Amino acid sequence: MASACGAPGPGGALGSQAPSWYHRDLSRAAAEELLARAGRDGSFLVRDSESVAGAFALCVLYQKHVHTYRILPDGEDFLAVQTSQGVPVRRFQTLGELIGLYAQPNQGLVCALLLPVEGEREPDPPDDRDASDGEDEKPPLPPRSGSTSISAPTGPSSPLPAPETPTAPAAESAPNGLSTVSHDYLKGSYGLDLEAVRGGASHLPHLTRTLATSCRRLHSEVDKVLSGLEILSKVFDQQSSPMVTRLLQQQNLPQTGEQELESLVLKLSVLKDFLSGIQKKALKALQDMSSTAPPAPQPSTRKAKTIPVQAFEVKLDVTLGDLTKIGKSQKFTLSVDVEGGRLVLLRRQRDSQEDWTTFTHDRIRQLIKSQRVQNKLGVVFEKEKDRTQRKDFIFVSARKREAFCQLLQLMKNKHSKQDEPDMISVFIGTWNMGSVPPPKNVTSWFTSKGLGKTLDEVTVTIPHDIYVFGTQENSVGDREWLDLLRGGLKELTDLDYRPIAMQSLWNIKVAVLVKPEHENRISHVSTSSVKTGIANTLGNKGAVGVSFMFNGTSFGFVNCHLTSGNEKTARRNQNYLDILRLLSLGDRQLNAFDISLRFTHLFWFGDLNYRLDMDIQEILNYISRKEFEPLLRVDQLNLEREKHKVFLRFSEEEISFPPTYRYERGSRDTYAWHKQKPTGVRTNVPSWCDRILWKSYPETHIICNSYGCTDDIVTSDHSPVFGTFEVGVTSQFISKKGLSKTSDQAYIEFESIEAIVKTASRTKFFIEFYSTCLEEYKKSFENDAQSSDNINFLKVQWSSRQLPTLKPILADIEYLQDQHLLLTVKSMDGYESYGECVVALKSMIGSTAQQFLTFLSHRGEETGNIRGSMKVRVPTERLGTRERLYEWISIDKDEAGAKSKAPSVSRGSQEPRSGSRKPAFTEASCPLSRLFEEPEKPPPTGRPPAPPRAAPREEPLTPRLKPEGAPEPEGVAAPPPKNSFNNPAYYVLEGVPHQLLPPEPPSPARAPVPSATKNKVAITVPAPQLGHHRHPRVGEGSSSDEESGGTLPPPDFPPPPLPDSAIFLPPSLDPLPGPVVRGRGGAEARGPPPPKAHPRPPLPPGPSPASTFLGEVASGDDRSCSVLQMAKTLSEVDYAPAGPARSALLPGPLELQPPRGLPSDYGRPLSFPPPRIRESIQEDLAEEAPCLQGGRASGLGEAGMSAWLRAIGLERYEEGLVHNGWDDLEFLSDITEEDLEEAGVQDPAHKRLLLDTLQLSK
């Protein structure tokens, strides 16, 4: 928390010196934390108001509650505390006078102002330069920032004297001595001129002499320029300019001061005309010279290079029964003709004959990705008489499968009958260029080639729709850089990309280019910049941003360069918060929301400068072995995100490339980790400084297809980083039925809303609703109920009477399903926001109310939770919709319950659909036409490589450490989780002793903690579930408890009765035993077993960024990650049956459904039986039905196979067997030697051992 003691304020309200109780730019939440730490009645501070510019907020602590009073300036710059009607207003000239009066008792405040609370300052070294680690050792002189750049705002007045202090010394040393001469004139000759004017003089001789003296150097410079231009002019025209010649001849003649000034003005006028004339002369001369030459070629109008036909070698995946009929599995060649819109299936027969079938693009109905087998893909073809057929193919690799899917999507898009696209591809590049010009060839950056997750060679040349290039320490001029980018793209794609925006701040630049066909789809372009150096004004660090609308979808792009230095993590965090708050992008009507909530899709990238907290030799050893997992555990950015300090609920693709900084220039083989400085040797450990993160609205479509770095661009000590994204977009919807009439109006109706807000205040609140589908924002009435079980948190509730009915401007479901609602919870006393959130309308559409549940945040900090019940009523005649192109690819739901390689957990209810590695959970959707018939079925938790057709997601963090504890148990029941909405055990404020709960008794049953983490303090609140989670199995269930055992509420908070409108399976159906620990409330809780994952190299013990799910935080009692863990299971139990846990295996027709919009994961994994796949493929149903019989799913057989392989010491082959379809012991008995070889078993002894063991088990 940073607070400055500068002195903004109207009319010098703070006097000549800012007092200790004044905190500039301090947030409301941070102010309450400072007062809570003070802990004494009468503690107070003054901060800037968040709702009214130029106003202040007086915060007073009394009886452990914070009371806030607004201090408003009037038209005469007097200050007064806002009072109730009828109370006389007292006016003050300064804040000091105001505080002095209210420090006396009985002045109308809740208590007298007794104890001023000072801010916490981060100690800075005397020379506070960002180049502390040698990163910017010789930065070029920064150019002037453009007119669109903005700096941190300062108040209209300053406590310091006039503007002469910081600039005078520099000005005195200016080469022309202008400031010195001017200063001398004002001190001496000014008086003489004044006397002369009083005496009737009509001119100012001393001022004239002063100006002439100051401009003498300008005289000589103009003479030099004129002389050079005259020579250049003679190249194109033999005649000289007589005026120029005369002026040059007079340059050595003696002149008086007045004559000198007249001569200078004349020279400047001649120079202006001469510059214009010489251009015309040159143009005419060159036109005459080329009149006999052949005409210049016309600009190229070629379209993008055509995509050649691509072939993929695959094997047909068949059942065991079919395999016995046809013998060895069949091999196919799939040829994709994007330009022709055809897919050809070529099957090679044993007698060398070929059999092929051609499907046009409109006969390919759906692609179904297997979640469990990464290189398996189901393709649904349309046959005659409206029948379909599904074929499952096994590709050579998962990358080939993704390339095939991308080509088919491109083919569908190219031949679509839709006028506007449903999906576009976006390239994001970030590169710290090290103040060195780039090499001639940067194609590998443009085409995402290099290390990490890269595109397949068949798709690298496909041009993206939008290219965004962010650079730092870029010494190339803006125009030159833009031309370089456009030229590179032109050479690569044969397309003339259009520049949409270019924004610079010093040497930080962001450039956005789009395909020519999309130029008219771009609107509302906005640019901005923020300085984050010393006092947010000096230095060379900061951020630049660009935002625009692509049809109906808003995009934001932020390129930043944060403070360098291993030890400056807190400063980097503050840089991020400053950028988040001060960058002015997007819709101005959404100024109540920070930029993380203003855009459908926000991409944040750049040189974030977060480092690795590990010894340099250990880092180098891990890099040499290409073991990045231990390094990612000590990555500062990951650690800070897991503590909710920065990038709240942003996503980042899994990192599989080496650290991009700090390389020896000219090579990518050596890290230059030591730097000789005057103060000694400076160590710059290799780090992932250059990153790409993103945040999207819930229930939107976004997939990260690549994330890596180049390995052949070596001019800088940073490697360029790239990321490519598949992004769903919406069109500017035009209703075929026209604007909504009263008879067919759509309505957004709320039954209730309930929020938990992190505050020590007890004021009333109201909600504001914003959306592009509304004509204007709407407000609710103040809440009609509130309660508090904890001093630092307040639960507020609104019934339907207090909530408005919203009327969208259009009533069509196709329009409404793409809309979102932004909510901000504001206080009645100061009209300041206590938290904002976004809710997708798609899941709320229906004839019955649906539940929504999400987090509140403010100024980048998590400040609460909000849940409610609402419905979007759409007239029946406006229910028509169509399938989006990105919904054409789905996840095989039959396999969704199987384990994935690295599952992760989400933290909210409504999330963007993303196929990235880090977003965490899949949810199968039902068609919108079915929304009025039945609620959606929730899928089990997982981490798919690609999204389902409608998978709401929130921003999870990456699990990096398998939790330690007891071996995986089964079959023991645990108590159901309690409702955290009324459980004070969840509410812990950072640095403040818990005042309502007894201290936690020691728990001897806690899982052992690694030695490297013994210096950490246990947390007794829910942790944000960062570990791997075992997926539920039919008939088995899964644990509902969090990884940290001390997270369950005490037993005196029973769950409420089950609402009739929201019935679904409880989060824990068949809980499993685990180590018993006690939470703060004293309730016993059984921790879940460690999850299962594919074998990976063993990791040495060490501090883990995921330590929060182990129930630990860093030393120093840093509980910031649990400032708001208050409702990790916010509403799970409110809708859980009160009776005993039921069996996880239910007959299909009786499966219970959750309300749409509730999370599949809210701090812990939910367990549901894997839903049956719903397809129109009749011939496949009979084949798939046995898989769900007998109370087992595919994951169960896989687990048995895993145990069997471990028993015989051959677990290394598990992944190869699973990827080739041998995932169940029941079918392994039919495996052959050839099948084992294809699965990677080459050792004859191992093959014999496997076959013999299987034979004995028959």
Swiss-Prot record:
Catalytic activity: a 1,2-diacyl-sn-glycero-3-phospho-(1D-myo-inositol-3,4,5-trisphosphate) + H2O = a 1,2-diacyl-sn-glycero-3-phospho-(1D-myo-inositol-3,4-bisphosphate) + phosphate; 1,2-dioctanoyl-sn-glycero-3-phospho-(1D-myo-inositol-3,4,5-trisphosphate) + H2O = 1,2-dioctanoyl-sn-glycero-3-phospho-(1D-myo-inositol-3,4-bisphosphate) + phosphate; 1,2-dihexadecanoyl-sn-glycero-3-phospho-(1D-myo-inositol-3,4,5-trisphosphate) + H2O = 1,2-dihexadecanoyl-sn-glycero-3-phospho-(1D-myo-inositol-3,4-bisphosphate) + phosphate
Entry comment describing in which tissues the protein is expressed: Widely expressed, most prominently in skeletal muscle, heart and brain. Present in platelets. Expressed in transformed myeloid cells and in primary macrophages, but not in peripheral blood monocytes.
InterPro entries in the cross-refs: Endo/exonu/phosph_ase_sf, IPPc, SAM, SAM/pointed_sf, SH2, SH2_dom_sf
Pfam families in the cross-refs: C2_SHIP1-2_2nd, C2_SHIP1-2_first, Exo_endo_phos2, SAM_1, SH2
Residues spanning the signal sequence: none
Recorded topology in the membrane: Peripheral membrane protein
Biased composition (Basic and acidic residues): 119-132, 951-965
EC number: 3.1.3.86
Domain SH2: 21-117
Record GO terms (molecular function): actin binding; inositol-polyphosphate 5-phosphatase activity; phosphatidylinositol-3,4,5-trisphosphate 5-phosphatase activity; SH2 domain binding; SH3 domain binding
Residue positions, PTM Phosphothreonine: T165, T958
Effect of D607A: Abolishes enzyme activity but not phosphorylation upon FCGR2A clustering
Residue interval(s) of motif SH3-binding: 944-949
The protein's enzyme class: hydrolase
GO annotation, biological process: actin filament organization; apoptotic process; cell adhesion; endochondral ossification; endocytosis; ERK1 and ERK2 cascade; establishment of mitotic spindle orientation; gene expression
Induction: By bacterial lipopolysaccharides (LPS).
Protein location: Cytoplasm, Cytosol; Cytoplasm, Cytoskeleton; Membrane; Cell projection, Filopodium
Keyword Magnesium applies: no
Biological role: Phosphatidylinositol (PtdIns) phosphatase that specifically hydrolyzes the 5-phosphate of phosphatidylinositol-3,4,5-trisphosphate (PtdIns(3,4,5)P3) to produce PtdIns(3,4)P2, thereby negatively regulating the PI3K (phosphoinositide 3-kinase) pathways. Required for correct mitotic spindle orientation and therefore progression of mitosis. Plays a central role in regulation of PI3K-dependent insulin signaling, although the precise molecular mechanisms and signaling pathways remain unclear.
Family classification: Belongs to the inositol 1,4,5-trisphosphate 5-phosphatase family.
Further facts: Its ability to confer resistance to dietary obesity suggests that it may serve as a possible therapeutic target in cases of type 2 diabetes and obesity.
Entry's disease: Genetic variations in INPPL1 may be a cause of susceptibility to metabolic syndrome. Metabolic syndrome is characterized by diabetes, insulin resistance, hypertension, and hypertriglyceridemia is absent. Opsismodysplasia: A rare skeletal dysplasia involving delayed bone maturation. Clinical signs observed at birth include short limbs, small hands and feet, relative macrocephaly with a large anterior fontanel, and characteristic craniofacial abnormalities including a prominent brow, depressed nasal bridge, a small anteverted nose, and a relatively long philtrum. Death secondary to respiratory failure during the first few years of life has been reported, but there can be long-term survival.
Record note on quaternary structure: Interacts with tyrosine phosphorylated form of SHC1. Interacts with EGFR. Upon stimulation by the EGF signaling pathway, it forms a complex with SHC1 and EGFR. Interacts with cytoskeletal protein SORBS3/vinexin, promoting its localization to the periphery of cells. Forms a complex with filamin (FLNA or FLNB), actin, GPIb (GP1BA or GP1BB) that regulates cortical and submembraneous actin. Interacts with c-Met/MET, when c-Met/MET is phosphorylated on 'Tyr-1356'. Interacts with p130Cas/BCAR1. Interacts with CENTD3/ARAP3 via its SAM domain. Interacts with c-Cbl/CBL and CAP/SORBS1.
Record protein name field: Phosphatidylinositol 3,4,5-trisphosphate 5-phosphatase 2
